[in-house]
């Protein structure tokens, strides 16, 4: 059990530094390029572990599995993470971190809608409390920049959807979480690479360049911009945050259960703004602090509720 908590702590720190490191790298790379690099390298870094898990289970990847990975890659990497990346660029890292941490709440709602899983009373309360916390941070009445916030919410929503489809896929195809993640990242990166290629087609690039808001999506570079000064940060994002964060998260899940592993997303809303304050010197308003506290309370309700549910019902949980 001690090992599990070590995995949770490492994963939480890696994930909590995600928005900050992405913000720091944002100056040297295009957002979509950064997304492409981190999922390509992260996915490849997780691949040996995924292949090891497959050979241990005597499994092979079939064509129909590729369809699943292409779909999860599209939702997680192309849609969710692109919105997320642009959100980090236009908004405060701390705000994006907190809003994105609400993705397990959206996942709960989707699991109810798609997998027809029942929402326990504690989970329902957690959803409501967390949404209240989000509203306090977001404070819709004082919205100066609705763009960053809308993008963060879309990213969290679609990531919640991805985790449910991923869970459904791993249950149906019997892949473990790490295998699912590695192939999702690689397929998502390939899909992004295709879209990036399209952005180099002259007529399309010209059209995008004419709109100042869309000009950054024209001629998206693949590898240019990598220098000796930012290579370490880029490696940290690819291997630390993307491969390491997810890797340790799944290790925690495999040595314990889903609710313990998901502690990662519960500690993050509190830790990420503190790191943003220390590293990026972002000002954190009183309402943000209040919202963070409420979200953490909501997460605690969900975590404690899951704990009790596990004690009453010792059935093993499906992986996220």
Task: Describe each model-derived feature in a short phrase.
Residues 1-36, 143-168, 190-194, 312-320:
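Glycine-/small-residue-enriched transmembrane alpha-helix faces in small-molecule transporters
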Residues 3-11, 58-83, 147-155, 207-244:
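Loop-to-transmembrane-helix transition segments
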Residues 14-19, 54-94, 100, 136, ...:
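Specific transmembrane alpha-helical segments of multi-pass solute transporters/efflux pumps
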Residues 28-79, 106-107, 158-165, 182-203, ...:
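Transmembrane alpha-helices of multi-pass small-molecule transport proteins
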Residues 33-44, 84-118, 123-124, 155, ...:
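Specific alpha-helical transmembrane segments that line the substrate/conduction pathway
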Residues 37, 93-102, 166-189, 238-278:
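Helix-helix packing/entry segments at the starts of transmembrane helices
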Residues 39, 230, 262, 266-320:
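C-terminal-most transmembrane helix of multi-pass membrane proteins
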Residues 46, 110, 119-139, 156-159, ...:
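Hydrophobic transmembrane alpha-helices of multi-pass small-molecule transport proteins
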């Amino acid at each position: 059990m001690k090992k599990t908590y070590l995995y949770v702590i490492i994963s939480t720190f890696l994930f909590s530094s995600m928005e900050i490191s992405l913000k720091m790298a944002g100056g040297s790379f295009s957002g979509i390029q950064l997304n492409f690099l981190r999922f390509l390298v992260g996915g490849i870094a997780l691949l040996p572990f995924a292949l090891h898990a497959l050979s241990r289970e005597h499994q092979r990847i079939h064509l129909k599995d590729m369809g699943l990975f292409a779909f999860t890659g599209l939702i997680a990497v192309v849609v969710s993470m692109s919105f997320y990346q642009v959100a980090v660029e236009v908004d405060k890292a701390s705000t994006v971190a907190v809003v994105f941490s609400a993705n397990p709440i959206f996942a709960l709602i989707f699991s109810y809608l798609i997998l027809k899983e029942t929402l326990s009373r504690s989970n329902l309360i957690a959803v409501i409390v967390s949404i209240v916390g989000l509203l306090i941070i977001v404070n819709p009445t004082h919205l100066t920049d609705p763009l960053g916030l809308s993008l963060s919410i879309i990213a969290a929503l679609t990531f919640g959807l991805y985790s449910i489809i991923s869970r459904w896929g791993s249950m149906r195809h019997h892949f473990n979480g790490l295998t699912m993640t590695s192939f999702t990242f690689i397929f998502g990166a390939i899909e992004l690479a295709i879209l990036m290629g399209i952005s180099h087609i002259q007529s399309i690039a010209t059209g995008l360049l004419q709109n100042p808001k869309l000009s950054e999506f024209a001629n998206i570079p693949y590898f240019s911009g990598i220098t000796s000064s930012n290579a370490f940060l880029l490696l940290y994002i690819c291997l630390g945050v993307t491969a390491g964060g997810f890797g340790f998260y799944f290790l925690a899940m495999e040595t314990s259960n889903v609710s313990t592993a998901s502690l990662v997303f519960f500690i993050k809303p509190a830790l990420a703004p503190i790191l943003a304050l220390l590293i990026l010197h972002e000002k954190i308003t009183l309402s943000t602090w209040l919202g963070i506290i409420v979200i953490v309370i909501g997460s605690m309700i969900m975590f404690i509720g899951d704990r009790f549910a596990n004690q009453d019902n010792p059935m093993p949980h499906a992986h996220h």
